[in-house]
From Swiss-Prot:
Protein keywords: Cytoplasm, GTP-binding, Ligase, Magnesium, Metal-binding, Nucleotide-binding, Purine biosynthesis
GO molecular function: adenylosuccinate synthase activity; GTP binding; magnesium ion binding
Sites where the protein binds GTP: 12-18, 40-42, 305, 331-333, 413-415
UniProt-annotated catalytic positions: 13, 41
GO cellular component: cytoplasm
EC number, as in UniProt: 6.3.4.4
Name of this protein: Adenylosuccinate synthetase
Organism the protein comes from: Clostridioides difficile (strain 630) (Peptoclostridium difficile)
């Protein structure tokens, strides 16, 4: 089997898009199987930037089939807006397939997302207000509307009417809102979407399964990151899906034994968006410098990301829960110009040293980083394409990460463009 899963191994925003785009040029099939358009990643090809939220990264390769799997919560309006971006540049989108089992996001999901976040007050969790959580709630409550329902206008009308009646009761009685959702408006809007996406809809599980069985190269594209996983992340400051390797198989509609390699995407430092404890966060000039040099602002929200030093406790945890077989080390060039670079090797909580990532956020908030300090480098590394040509201190930094995490670094990124990538092992080989 030639199947590779790409997993964000921190809090997301690690640079997955670049790695996925790089590997997508070799892949026959690219699959997204969790989350929705709350996640964003940017592809840079020949100086042109494409901000993707729903569409898999293989769309730029006309020979690659791009799957939006059953584990996705699908915003048809957002999807069609992304399509326009490619049509403007005359890029074909005929290679996209949408699972008929994917659940659909509606306006009431987005409104309830915003109302719920507002009602939390000081306990807000930092939602993107894209309706992701409420849509997954309907899914687990077994009242959600799927793509296959949307394709049948009569069945869709019955299900939508029931949902709008229920959501209007919530909006009116819990949140005290007088402006309610109108069935006819939403029904007609989504019938229009249904006709526009109909040609893309398929049983994508069959497509992925057949591709794997045929020995084709299949790339599973993760969104967000391990520490945002609903079960394994920094709960409750997490997403509503499973952006870990275990969730990818379910979201693609195949068995877990069909994913051979799991590549962890890891930044050379650490960032986070939203609320929650962040042990190595630098609320100082160091954090500001990382943010400015790394252009650390969210693709989807534009929010400035919180920045800090590399945290080996986090990445070692990600290696364990994902079964990482390889690491792609991203944004190494951002650390150029730092005299000293710190790496968090463990946590100190009271008089105890902790090497495993704690479940309790109260415990995590009490933790202080235990750092090992390494010498930095000043040389420009953005044009280097051979690992041996990196500055000695940069190579030592990568070696230290491998030592602490216990997984080999097989790819190193030294700039945003596809060409600015150092390959130490061909992951699809």
């Amino acid at each position: 089997m030639k199947t590779v899963a790409i997993v964000g191994s921190q809090w997301g925003d690690e640079g997955k898009g670049k790695v996925i785009d790089y590997l997508a040029t070799q892949a026959d099939v690219v699959v997204r199987g969790q989350g929705g358009n709350n996640a964003g990643h940017t592809l840079v090809v020949e100086g042109k930037k494409y901000a993707l939220h729903l569409i898999p990264s293989g769309v730029l390769n006309p020979n690659t089939v791009n799957i939006i799997g059953n584990g996705i919560v699908f915003d048809p309006k957002g999807f069609l807006e992304e399509l326009e971006m490619f049509k403007t540049d005359n890029i074909s989108t005929e290679n996209i397939k949408i699972s008929d089992r994917a659940h659909v996001i509606f306006p009431y999901h987005k409104e309830l997302d915003a109302l719920s976040e507002e009602a939390r007050g000081d306990l807000k969790i930092g939602t993107t207000k894209k309706g992701i959580g409420p849509c997954y709630m309907d899914k687990t409550e077994r009242s959600g509307i799927r793509i296959c329902d949307l394709m049948d206008k009569d069945k869709f009308a019955i299900k939508l009417k029931a949902q709008i009646d229920a959501k209007n009761e919530i909006v009116k009685n819990i949140y005290g809102k007088e402006e309610l959702f109108d069935f006819e408006t939403i029904y007609n809007e989504y019938l229009g979407y249904a006709e526009q996406i109909r040609k893309y809809v398929a049983d994508t599980s069959v497509i992925v399964y057949d591709a794997v069985r045929a020995g084709k190269k299949v790339l599973f594209e993760g969104a967000q990151g391990t520490l945002l996983d609903l079960d394994l992340g920094t709960y409750p400051f997490v997403t509503s899906s499973h952006p870990t390797s275990g969730g990818f198989a379910i979201g693609a509609g195949i068995g877990p034994n069909m994913i051979k390699d799991v590549v962890g995407i890891v930044k050379a430092y650490t960032t986070r968006v939203g609320e929650g404890p962040f042990v190595t966060e630098q609320i100082n000039e160091t954090g500001d410098k990382i943010r400015e040099q790394g252009h650390e602002f969210g693709v989807t929200t534009g929010r400035p990301r919180r920045c800090g030093w590399f945290d080996a406790v986090i990445v070692k945890y990600a290696a364990r829960v994902n079964g990482l077989t390889s690491i792609s080390f991203m944004l190494l060039d951002v650390l150029t110009g730092f005299d000293k670079i710190k790496v968090c090797t463990s946590y100190k909580m009271g008089d105890k040293i902790i090497t495993d990532f704690p479940a309790s956020l109260d415990d995590l908030a009490k933790c202080e980083p235990v750092y090992e300090e390494l010498d930095g480098w000043n040389e420009d590394i953005t044009q280097i394409d051979n690992f041996d040509d990196l500055p000695e201190n940069a190579k030592k930094y990568v070696a230290k990460i491998e030592e602490l995490v216990g997984v080999s670094v097989d790819m190193v990124s030294v700039g945003p463009n596809r060409a600015q990538t150092i390959i130490r092992r061909n992951i699809f080989a």
